[in-house]
């Protein structure tokens, strides 16, 4: 998110960035994955050639860039990243803090898109936001690599101050039970079509530049008022939420 990053500069050394996959001119009003943009994953090959694969620890990506405005990966994009990472022995990490636990109609967006990463980070939905909790899922090979030391040694040298917090764990287990018992992931898939139809009904309204429904999420771009970026969105929030 450029406007966020420019306030703080580069926080982590040795990090390269792939091109943003969103192009309104080519993707506007797409439902689900846009058709255009899979080729942008090939930029990873240039980065590998520049630095050598042995110096690249991992590729980290959100299957759906949420905070930037609900920007789903183009069709075939994640598959290309997976293939390039496999070709060069690079780990692929999915940040599913937002997309995990039903928002995309599945436990994880990785399942929806049929692409298996080496690691998944998650939070938020694991407790339905009731109590802060997060975690990481890893492939068995990665797990085994950390478990080769003696039993008395710390398996993953990391901060443990709040690990396995009893309240957070109880909230997480209860939430997962509800997801399973009430079939909420399947229900999200069932409602997805209605959600997209309702969102796209706003297309003809003035100042609507783009609508991007995917799963039970949607991003809507509104034309800015002159000299007041964000004001139109705030007014829409006030009128649509606080007044109703």
Which ranges hold each PLM region?
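Conserved N-terminal phosphate-binding loop of PLP-dependent enzymes in the Aspartate aminotransferase
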Residues: 1-244
């Amino acid at each position: 998110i450029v406007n966020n990053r420019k306030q703080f500069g580069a926080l982590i050394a040795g990090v390269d960035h792939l091109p943003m996959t969103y192009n309104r001119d080519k993707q506007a009003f797409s439902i689900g994955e846009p058709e255009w943009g899979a080729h942008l994953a090939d930029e990873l090959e240039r980065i590998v050639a520049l630095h050598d694969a042995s110096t690249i620890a991992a590729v980290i990506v959100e299957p759906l860039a949420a905070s930037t405005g609900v920007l789903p990966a183009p069709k075939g994009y994640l598959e290309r990243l997976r293939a390039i990472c496999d070709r060069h022995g690079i780990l692929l990490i999915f940040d599913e803090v937002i997309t995990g636990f039903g928002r995309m109609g599945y436990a994880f967006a990785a399942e929806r898109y049929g692409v298996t990463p080496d690691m998944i980070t998650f939070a938020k939905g694991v407790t339905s936001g009731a109590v802060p909790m997060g975690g990481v899922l890893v492939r068995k090979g990665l797990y085994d690599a950390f478990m080769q030391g003696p039993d008395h040694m710390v398996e993953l040298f990391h901060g443990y101050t709040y690990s396995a917090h009893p309240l957070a764990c109880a909230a997480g287990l209860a939430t997962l039970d509800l997801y399973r018992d009430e079939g909420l992931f399947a229900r999200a898939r069932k409602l997805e079509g209605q959600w997209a139809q309702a969102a796209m009904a706003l297309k003809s309204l003035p100042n609507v530049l783009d609508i991007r429904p995917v799963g039970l999420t949607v991003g809507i771009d509104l034309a800015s008022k002159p000299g007041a970026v964000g004001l139109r969105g705030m007014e829409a929030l006030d009128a649509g939420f606080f007044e109703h």
